[in-house]
Amino acid sequence: MGINLAADSRVFIIEGISGSGKDTFQTYLKEQLEGPHLYDYSEGEVLHSWKHLQIEGILKLRIKFMKLFVNYVSDIVSRDENAVFLLNRFHLSAYVSTIIQQPKLKREYDDIINVLRTLPIHVFILQLDENEIEERSLHPERSSAWQKHQQQIVNKEGFRDRLERYLWQQGLMLEAAERQQIPYSVIKFPCALENGTRIASWT
C-alpha cells in the first residue's frame, strides 16, 4: 500500500482509536518530514491525552484551545512557506470525545472545521479490523490508572465492553471525516509501513 502525498500538504493530522498505532505512525512521519520548520505535537500537547479527561471543564477548554490553535497554524503556514505541522489527534478525536458528549459546543467546533478546510491539510485515519481491536487496545505497558480509567469510561458511556466502544468510535470518525470533506486517507496500520508507505519530500 503506497501513499504519495502532494507536496503542498503541510498540515498532517493522525487520527484513530486507542491502539491503532498513532504514536508509531507519528514517529515514522516525523522521520520523513524532519527539518527545522517541522512543528510536531503529541496528543497531550493538543489537550487530547486521557489524563485530561477527568478534569472538570476540560471539554469546553479543549474546544477553546483548538480554536486558538488552528488560527495559530493558519498564521504560521501563511508566513512560512516551509512550515509543516504534524499533530497526533485533533478534530476527529474531538468530535468523538467532546462534541458527542456536549453538543452545545458544536458551533465553536464548526468554526475549527471551517479553518481546517482552508489549510493545505491531509488527515491519516488509522483503522483496525474488529479482531485486532481487542488485542491492540489492551496496552499492557500502560499504568493501572489508565486501565481503570478505560473501564470507567466504558461503564459511564453505557457500552457493553471496550470493543463495542472502540468500534463505535472508529465508525464515527469515518462518518465525520466523509461529512467534513477535509482530505484524508484510511490506513490499515501497521500493514501500511510494512508495504512501503511513502510521503513526498519538501524542498
Task: Tell where the protein language model's regions lie, with residue ranges.
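P-loop (Walker A) phosphate-binding loop of NTP-binding proteins
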Residues: 17
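Walker A/P-loop
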Residues: 23
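Conserved substrate/cofactor phosphate-moiety recognition/catalytic segment
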Residues: 27-79, 98-99
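ATP-binding Walker
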Residues: 20
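Glycine-rich phosphate-binding loop used to anchor ATP phosphates in small-molecule kinases
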Residues: 62-118
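NTP-dependent small-molecule kinase module
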Residues: 2, 162-203
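Hydrophobic anchor at the beta1->P-loop junction of P-loop NTPases
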Residues: 14
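A glycine- and Lys/Arg-enriched "phosphate-lid" helix/loop adjacent to the NTP-binding pocket
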Residues: 114-169
